[in-house]
Structure formats: structure tokens, C-alpha cells
A protein has these predicted regions:
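RNA substrate-binding interface of SAM-dependent RNA methyltransferases
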Residues: 1-2, 38-131
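Hydrophobic alpha-helical segments and helix pairs
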Residues: 14-56
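General small-molecule cofactor/ligand-binding pocket signal
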Residues: 7-10, 105, 167
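Active-site/ligand-binding-proximal alpha/beta "capping" segment
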Residues: 125-175
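N-terminal positively charged helical leader segments and presequences
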Residues: 1-20
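Structured adenosyl-cofactor binding patch, chiefly the S-adenosyl-L-methionine
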Residues: 26, 68-72, 86-99, 157-196
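Short coil/turn connectors at secondary-structure junctions
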Residues: 5, 24-25, 46-48, 73-75, ...
């Protein structure tokens, strides 16, 4: 190509060995993944709307949250070190390209990070089965961070205690909770709607 991009045509067997999917699309690329600083994620000129993911294990959930976050106007994703790898091929596929546009940060101590958010005036809301208020009762027009926990165990006690407010998504029937990505979408779009 005229833009200087290098490419190479390889044999089908070689291509198959390079891919991690059974039915690859026929194009493979190697790119440098973006890296962000805490300041870049928190101070991008917009009122913060953050997702804090604590120990989510399913790469598909992480990718879906990132994709949905871009659509809902989220300004950054914060992930604990125990969260599924953002560079996992399944995560990247699930983002449908949003991973290249959504600022993210991987932190060693997510609880300490949440405490720093509060110091910056960002209100932290933990999605929690024991939430006192329905998510619809809160104001997300200011700096907001939603805390989402592990698919099987939810948020750790330390993370829930670090939050300023425990919120819940009301459930009908015998369902206790929603999938982490779906719960995240509900919260992100509530904030998006309040900010329109």
C-alpha cells in the first residue's frame, strides 16, 4: 500500500496456525496496543463516567462492557489486575474495535484506586445485591464510577465498603442478578440518559 504499511501473503496452513479461531476472516494484523496513564483516563475534558471492573473472569463480558461503554459515553474503564486480560483475543473480538478507542487502566489495587476517585469528587456506586437504593434513584450527572464485581462472587467486601453507595437493579421472579455485562449496560445507559 502507498501508506507504507507492510504486508505479507502466507500459505493457508501457515495462516491457520497463526490464528486462534476455527474460521478466520483471512486478514491478520499486528498492532501496538494503546496504554494510558491515570491522568489520561481521568482528565480527558469530560465529566467522568467510569466503569471499575473487579476480577471479572469472562473475556466476552469484559469485551462487551468495553463495547457498550463506548456507545454509552463512558470516559474510561478501570480493571483490577485479576480481571480477564484486555488483550485476550476473545476480549478484543467482543469489543468490535472499541478497545482501540476506549481509554482503560489496569490497576494493582482497585480498592485504593476507588478511594482516590472519591478524593477527586467522583461518586462511586457499587452494583450490589444488598443495594439500599434502586439504580434509578441516584444522580449520575456529576463524576460517576460504577463498580462491577466478579461474575460468580460479585464485589469483594473491601470494594463494596469503599463505594459511597450500594445500588441494586430491581429483579422480578426468582432471578437474583443479571450477567455482569448486562448489569453494566443498564447502569451505563441510565447515566447516559441522565446526561443527555
Amino acid at each position: 500500500p502507498s501508506d507504507g504499511t507492510e504486508y505479507e501473503v502466507v500459505d493457508d496452513r501457515v495462516f491457520q496456525a497463526m490464528c486462534d479461531t476455527k474460521t478466520p476472516q483471512g486478514v491478520l494484523s499486528v498492532i501496538r496496543m494503546p496504554h494510558y496513564t491515570e491522568e489520561e483516563v481521568l482528565n480527558n475534558g469530560k465529566t467522568p463516567l467510569l466503569m471499575v471492573l473487579e476480577d471479572l473472569q469472562d473475556p466476552g463480558n469484559v469485551g462487551t462492557i468495553i463495547r457498550t461503554a463506548e456507545g454509552a459515553g463512558v470516559t474510561g474503564i478501570i480493571m483490577s489486575r485479576g480481571t480477564a486480560d484486555i488483550f485476550n483475543p476473545k476480549t478484543i473480538r467482543s469489543t468490535m474495535g472499541s478497545v482501540y478507542r476506549m481509554p482503560f487502566l489496569i490497576v494493582d489495587d482497585a480498592v485504593a484506586f476507588v478511594k482516590r476517585l472519591k478524593e477527586r469528587g467522583i461518586c462511586t456506586y457499587a452494583a450490589h445485591l444488598h443495594g439500599v437504593h434502586s439504580y434509578r434513584e441516584e444522580d449520575y450527572t456529576g463524576g460517576t464510577a460504577f463498580l462491577i464485581g466478579n461474575e460468580g462472587n460479585g464485589l469483594t467486601d473491601d470494594m463494596a465498603e469503599a463505594a459511597q453507595c450500594l445500588i441494586r437493579i430491581p429483579m422480578e421472579g426468582k432471578v437474583e442478578s443479571l450477567n455482569a455485562a448486562i448489569a453494566s449496560a443498564v447502569l451505563m445507559y441510565e447515566a447516559h440518559g441522565q446526561r443527555e
